């Protein structure tokens, strides 16, 4: 084999190592997706007393207006399965934005109403920058449609009035606007009132095709499922 032939072989081997290493690196980075949104553990009475919180500091009921806090603990995101080249099982891609605002009202101790949540989709990030760019430029086209909104279609009546520190569940109907398209969605929410805060978590099953979203393939991703989930954890503080 001449010098030119050897150089070609070396070049092919190097290219294979680079590409193979890239696939392995991508696969290793996507092997551990963050878990779905879940309620934080209920604060203990002892912890509240240690922090100087007393019954006089906290309202007796959660009634009133609440707003999403701005300390970065709230997020709205997505979960979707993507198939990577040369891997047998799909990877669950997860992206989140902590740029979330919104308000809700609690009335009569057991009714949630006037909910409106907005998320800045240009701030969505995952463990892969190429995925994030594909979502911004194609997919969600968040440069063109930067905001997602969720509103209640009607008030949610809880089965029981919330007790401080205890988990409650609520079901209802909302209106989700993504990619310039608004559709009704079924809501199955879990929440916990912890005196000065209320945390609400949930997942909304959606189909990208319902919102005219083209799955944004990139790099080693050969296919993306149409079904996805809007995943969120919202921490509210009293206004």
Residue positions per predicted region:
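Low-complexity, acidic/polar, glycine-enriched regions of mature
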Residues: 2-239
């Amino acid at each position: 084999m001449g010098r030119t032939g050897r150089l070609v072989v070396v070049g092919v081997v190097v290219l294979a190592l680079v590409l193979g290493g890239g696939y392995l690196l991508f696969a290793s980075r996507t092997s551990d997706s963050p878990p779905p949104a879940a309620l934080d553990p209920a604060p203990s009475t002892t912890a509240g007393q240690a922090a100087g919180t007393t019954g006089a500091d906290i309202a007796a009921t959660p009634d009133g207006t609440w707003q999403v806090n701005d300390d970065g603990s709230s997020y709205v995101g997505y979960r979707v399965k993507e198939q990577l080249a040369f891997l047998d099982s799909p990877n669950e891609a997860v992206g989140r934005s902590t740029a979330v605002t919104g308000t809700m009202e609690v009335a009569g101790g057991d009714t949630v109403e006037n909910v409106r949540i907005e998320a800045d989709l240009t701030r969505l990030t995952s463990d892969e920058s190429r995925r994030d760019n594909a979502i911004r430029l194609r997919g969600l086209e968040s440069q063109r449609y930067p905001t997602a909104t969720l509103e209640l279609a009607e008030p949610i009546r809880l089965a029981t009035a919330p007790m401080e520190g205890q988990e409650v569940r609520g079901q209802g109907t909302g209106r989700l606007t993504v990619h310039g398209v608004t559709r009704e969605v079924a809501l199955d929410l879990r929440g916990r009132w912890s005196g000065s805060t209320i945390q609400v978590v949930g997942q909304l099953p959606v189909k990208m095709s319902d919102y005219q979203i083209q799955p944004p393939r990139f790099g080693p991703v050969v296919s993306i499922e149409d079904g996805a989930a809007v995943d969120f954890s919202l921490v509210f503080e009293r206004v």
